[in-house]
Amino acid sequence: MSFKTKLEKYAKLIVQSGLNVQEKQTVVISASIESYQLVREVTRQAYLVGAKEVVVHYSDEEVTRMKYENMAEDDFLQVPTWFSTFRNDYALMNACFLYIDDENPEMLAGIDPKKISNWQRAVKKACKTYFDLSDNMTNAWCIVGGATQKWANKVYPDMSNQEALDSLWNAIFKAAKIDEEHDPVELWNQHRQSFEKIVKEQKLRLD
């Protein structure tokens, strides 16, 4: 099965099972620029099931690191209005949120942890509406894996760049039950049903 076909199946799974995108619903995607192929395929799949709009927020880890290296500690206490408005408004519009976890795990190595914590606290406060609606499951959200070169090289240090990247993608596809014979959406539906059955049986025993 080609990489393109695997990516299509993965994106379909994300849209239909991970986010359960509804007709006329807005989808907000956050990802690094390296994950553009997955972002494009998720966008296509979302529109196929009737999404109203797909909004993409890209980041660049090199730019992000330069930001932390050069900005003052107190600057991370201020969240731009556009940033909080973006998250809060889309949450109030009942959008669903996809986060593609594809960053180099050592992207912020050596950065002053105070800067990072300042930004996290400031965002939590400024985007309270967004976090409240996510925490109580009003808004659907999902975190999925995406392969990037630096992450792949970290996981498979003895391989060439392309071999490492291919291996990481294959590991992600395998974890998501992407194969040639089965529909991953149906497989995950069966998995969910079996899990729900176990939970119900356990609850009956406890009662």
Question: Residue spans of the language-model regions?
Answer:
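Active-site bordering "gate/hinge" segments
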Residues: 1-207
